[in-house]
Amino acid sequence: MSSACDAGDHYPLHLLVWKNDYRQLEKELQGQNVEAVDPRGRTLLHLAVSLGHLESARVLLRHKADVTKENRQGWTVLHEAVSTGDPEMVYTVLQHRDYHNTSMALEGVPELLQKILEAPDFYVQMKWEFTSWVPLVSRICPNDVCRIWKSGAKLRVDITLLGFENMSWIRGRRSFIFKGEDNWAELMEVNHDDKVVTTERFDLSQEMERLTLDLMKPKSREVERRLTSPVINTSLDTKNIAFERTKSGFWGWRTDKAEVVNGYEAKVYTVNNVNVITKIRTEHLTEEEKKRYKADRNPLESLLGTVEHQFGAQGDLTTECATANNPTAITPDEYFNEEFDLKDRDIGRPKELTIRTQKFKAMLWMCEEFPLSLVEQVIPIIDLMARTSAHFARLRDFIKLEFPPGFPVKIEIPLFHVLNARITFGNVNGCSTAEESVSQNVEGTQADSASHITNFEVDQSVFEIPESYYVQDNGRNVHLQDEDYEIMQFAIQQSLLESSRSQELSGPASNGGISQTNTYDAQYERAIQESLLTSTEGLCPSALSETSRFDNDLQLAMELSAKELEEWELRLQEEEAELQQVLQLSLTDK
């Protein structure tokens, strides 16, 4: 077995962190690799945070330790900071995380603008259709047509779906215009409804100089929210992903399926073995918070094929020499010896972990003759939009997989447990001005000729602001995508709660009977709310406690929905069997 001396030889910086000798650590870090990993897969910063050594963590953060690094189990530094239950640790890590993310976003803009500049000019429409297998839920699923113009280093993206409030989707006409020139960039958000433009032109290098750690101080309620909510880490497991051609026809005459999408023939693929893995940790919560979380658990999961594994704390392994962040009294000799088996022991607060795995299927329509390039033209724009849109972020993660040959003219991917997004590309280079797009639909036809595609030019008026619009300078507000995402989820949750309460108080129908439509709508709206809550890290305890009384009604509603779906699938199987029997009889008669 290795000794502490051996650990000092092989992992000297890690040993200083273990001892929380932060003064010596400060001296020794000069010229050293701050991202070195120990035998257990932890960087210096991960080790400091897991052990609750705030002083060492601050030293490492001053030396630019990567606050976004994941450990061997896929947890980030912020996840581990929340697990300690130390508000000061969470505050420090969160501040540096936000500073790092904002810095990286600004640093990535020049490269992104260069990619956009080098790509051929084009116009394309992306139709977003949100669908659900749950009956009645599909009634409130929205559609949107996203219109994109690209000319040189200029980009314009038009959307009409703005948000969700009071059980209805908020619509409006918005344009986001990006202009790049050398080290300058101009960002404009155009509100066509109010004729107001928020704009800012800035020097990227100066922005980096102005950006300071003090500007990224988190609010106290943000720290409190994280400490009173479960730590949730959702990831897409695609290591066993498989693209299979979808078949069409009857038994014995089945062929590879192909469909025409907006004038282009596309091969249809089913994407199998896509797993959404959700890890939930609750060891930092009080017993009351844990009970509240368990009471508000998602009743959809039993109906959606979710496989769940729970792992308890290491209470039976705790020794007299243990500390709060080393409950099983692991010694440095044991920890830094890669040949020593720690079994179920580990540093950090004993984990109370739940792992949920759900399989999803996605669909792809691939066209090898599509005039756009996914890598050169489309991905840079999706990268840009993913910085402020959770839906674009999910699409970006998916399209960066290794697809079959061609361009994905149509994609269907899961967004949440009961919601899918279907994205269709169309009307390529069919619109050179903003006025033309108003009357056009994504179901456009193929471009008339190859020359029309290759010589396409965007009218520069697309990127200009109408004279009648009011321009508001210096209105930019730096957003972090994960916080926008949580705010969006919370808004949906609150809207659904208000709607459910109003429908519950509405009483019986005018004819004295029960209002079935309102009751079912409330149940299915609640289903969406519960589904969305499990997909976000920002759960609101007060709102969650208000919803527990609906669980029984929702469970019954979802069981009825699942039964209806099962009966529908059974009818389809019976019809296909009858068709096959008729076909065989006709062959026999011949």
Curated annotation (Swiss-Prot):
PROSITE patterns referenced in this protein's UniProt entry, alphabetically: ANK_REP_REGION, ANK_REPEAT, UIM
Any GO molecular function: ubiquitin-modified protein reader activity
GO annotation, cellular component aspect: cytoplasm; late endosome; perinuclear region of cytoplasm; plasma membrane
Record-level GO BP terms: negative regulation of protein localization to endosome; negative regulation of receptor internalization
A Pfam family that the UniProt record links to this protein: Ank_2
Record key words, sorted: ANK repeat, Cell membrane, Endosome, Membrane, Phosphoprotein, Repeat, Ubl conjugation
Cystines in this chain: none
Domain text: The UIM repeats 3 and 4 are required for binding to ubiquitinated EGFR and 'Lys-63'-linked ubiquitin.
Subunit annotation: Interacts (via the UIM 3 and 4 repeats) with EGFR (ubiquitinated); the interaction is direct, inhibited by ANKRD13A monoubiquitination and may regulate EGFR internalization.
Protein's recorded name: Ankyrin repeat domain-containing protein 13A
Species the sequence originates in: Homo sapiens (Human)
